[in-house]
A protein has these predicted regions:
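Bacterial N-terminal signal peptides
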Residues: 10-19
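Small beta-barrel nucleic-acid-binding modules, primarily SNase/OB-fold domains
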Residues: 2, 6-7, 20-146
């Protein structure tokens, strides 16, 4: 890559980091955001037109939970993943107020990790109580196929 492109990429990364860190300590009200859709129980895609351009479209992962994967290792995991996605989308669509808190980058820098509050209720508690997620602290994940 040319030096100019590298400089632009570094400048964009600094801008995104500064803008993101300015939001990280506060609740981010998602009520006017559009296009929210959950891929599975712990990953959602959002469009946030009120944020700076680099942050308007992003993938967010819910902090503190592990849910079955859509690209499952077994039929039971796939079945649970579909239920988790349905649960997540239903909860997000029904909420009048969606707020993100404790925003931070994941370890690869491609997704935002967040706590989500739906009408004041912590989403991860709701999906764990529904039996569609497990608490997760970053360690080794248990298989959903056993």
């Amino acid at each position: 890559m040319s030096t100019r492109i590298n400089t632009l990429l570094v400048a964009a990364a600094v801008f995104v980091t500064v803008a993101f860190n300015a939001l990280a300590d506060d609740f981010l009200n998602m009520r006017e955001f559009r296009g929210n859709v959950c891929y599975d129980g712990d990953t959602c895609y959002v469009i946030a037109p009120t944020l700076p351009e680099p942050l308007q479209k992003m993938s967010v992962r819910i902090l503190g939970i592990d849910t079955p994967e859509m690209r499952a290792e077994c039929a039971e995991e796939k079945k649970l993943a579909l239920k988790g996605r349905e649960f997540a989308n239903k909860m997000f669509r029904a909420a009048e107020k969606i707020e993100f808190a404790n925003l931070k980058w994941d370890k690869y820098g491609g997704r935002v990790l967040v706590d989500v509050y739906l009408d004041g209720k912590l989403y991860k508690d709701e999906i764990i109580n529904a039996g569609l997620a497990r608490p997760y602290d970053g360690g080794t994940k248990e298989s959903w196929c056993e």
